Amino acid sequence: MSAYVMSLVAKKLGYLELVDIGSGDGRIAYCGKILDFNSHSIEIDDVLVNLQNTICSETNQNFNPKCDDALEFEYSKLNLKKPVFFIGGLAQMGGDILATSIIKKINSISNLKMSTGIVFAGSDTKRQLSGNLSNGGWSSLIEENQLDVLDTVSLPTVWTFDQNVETPYIFTKFK
């Protein structure tokens, strides 16, 4: 249900394509496809991509699973016009490195930066290496990359065993 709500928020913000980075079982890309997005799923784990392919064939909903390293993937091949990128991973658990790389790739594609949205999964749970938890732990990256926060939606999802509260999803765009 949370993946559907996130995809619906992105739809209401006017995005046309959905790219789920570190997609796991593909639920966000799947929900995007149901909502008529041109969806793409990028996952490095071949077992999870096989699961996604099974879901696509069993449901007749092709959300374009790709078994690839998101850091190396050539996003220009997708011919994106107005995409929203969902970045898997928490900022303090390596997600910031992934997000920084994806942002650089977005910036390298002409005319894509100003039409792109990025959604981050946040956390309100303090961890050993976590710093500022504003904007779900993403505030430094948001400031460094000149992103505007459009909306924050807290949904009943749990990323780790020590987080027993809702997960904030931070919807951003370039300034």
Name these PLM-found stretches.
Residues G26-Y30:
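Glycine-rich SAM-binding Motif I of class I
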Residues N38-E43:
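Conserved SAM-binding motif I beta-strand of class I
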Residues V49-N50:
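Short alpha-helix immediately C-terminal to the canonical SAM-binding loop
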Residues D96-E166:
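C-terminal substrate-binding/active-site "lid" region of AdoMet-derived donor-dependent transferases
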